[in-house]
Amino acid sequence: MKLKFDLKKKNGNARRGQLTFERGTVQTPAFMPVGTYGTVKGMTPEEVKGTGAEILLGNTFHLWLRPGQEVMKMHGDLHDFMNWHGPILTDSGGFQVFSLGKMRTITEKGVHFRNPVNGDKIFMDAEKSMEIQKDLGSDIVMIFDECTPYPATHNEAKKSMEMSLRWAQRSRDHFDKLENPNNLFGIVQGGVYEDLRDVSVKGLTEIGFDGYAVGGLAVGEPKEDMHRILEHTCPQLPEDKPRYLMGVGKPEDLVEGVRRGIDMFDCVMPTRNARNGHLFVTGGVIKIRNAKHKTDTTPLDPHCDCYTCQNYSKSYLHHLERCNEILGARLNTIHNLRYYQRLMESIRKAIDEDRFDEFVQEFYARRDREVPPLSKA
């Protein structure tokens, strides 16, 4: 079904809302854990839900290569395959193809590349991406686009953005031809160039989508450029549609995104960092492998209500990390995912109570850092 987006409140540029799907509701601003291969690494769906997550992200490109569309359809769709019955957003595969570097060739038609699993020659285009995502049963389908690399000259970024707009129209047309009852999001491109972002927004809104993502950021550009582009782009996006910042990010990035009007985020950071023993806490990051934690009998974060913090000490987690025990990665992941969801809960509460600016000040004070300035403050 078509999602319903209720924008309940604004506090400055920060937005408080709710997404309603047939499979459930999502409170925004929202963070989506990443389940690349149909699993949030190391977690059961019940555990992921227990951290507070209401929507997951799946990866079209990787699920197309393994296990493939036919296996997916044998189960019904991705929800049935992985036993997650809340909403799922799937990316289009564009970023993964971009990440292949020299293994791929981009043309107007689409992208030719070698399958990184077995070396076979393979082709993906806007139409194929729409077909795969329909078979996945994605509640939110992303258009097929080219992620503009950084750095890129103005001319390079312009050509990339213009092709992404043409692919956006093809994605829209094929999505409609397939009679997909779910939702299609456009992706704003244009690199770090404000004039190109303007053209992209205008083109996408003329085509018309159920929501709009800001893509091509967090690809190596300075933070100041990301903030500048967000501040420039978000006010141009339709007020009544959800806004999604793709592939972002650190806790600070989520706060800064909300400050500039973003509603949805995804990133592998909480799960990947957990597996590397980097754990997010109220005051920053704990590297649990460090020797100083060997005899520390306190929990990771006294403010955290996750299963890990309620039951285990830093000393035990340090021991598991040193011994490379699988349980360590699982407990770390539970904690990091819950940290991200608690952060979003705190952000939503602050917006509800008209004290988001105060929340931002407190957030950075706990990290002993200055609040980054708004470019257009």
From Swiss-Prot:
Assembly with partners or alone: Homodimer. Within each dimer, one monomer is responsible for RNA recognition and catalysis, while the other monomer binds to the replacement base PreQ1.
GO biological processes: queuosine biosynthetic process; tRNA wobble guanine modification; tRNA-guanine transglycosylation
Q: What is stated as this protein's family in its record?
A: Belongs to the queuine tRNA-ribosyltransferase family.
Q: Which gene encodes it?
A: tgt
Q: Which UniProt keywords apply?
A: Glycosyltransferase, Metal-binding, Queuosine biosynthesis, Transferase, tRNA processing, Zinc
Look up the record and name the cofactor or cofactors this protein needs: Zn(2+)
Q: What role is this protein assigned? A: Catalyzes the base-exchange of a guanine (G) residue with the queuine precursor 7-aminomethyl-7-deazaguanine (PreQ1) at position 34 (anticodon wobble position) in tRNAs with GU(N) anticodons (tRNA-Asp, -Asn, -His and -Tyr). Catalysis occurs through a double-displacement mechanism. The nucleophile active site attacks the C1' of nucleotide 34 to detach the guanine base from the RNA, forming a covalent enzyme-RNA intermediate. The proton acceptor active site deprotonates the incoming PreQ1, allowing a nucleophilic attack on the C1' of the ribose to form the product.
Among NCBIfam families, the record links this protein to: Q_tRNA_tgt (TIGR00430), tgt_general (TIGR00449)
HAMAP family associated with the record: Q_tRNA_Tgt
Q: What is this protein called?
A: Queuine tRNA-ribosyltransferase
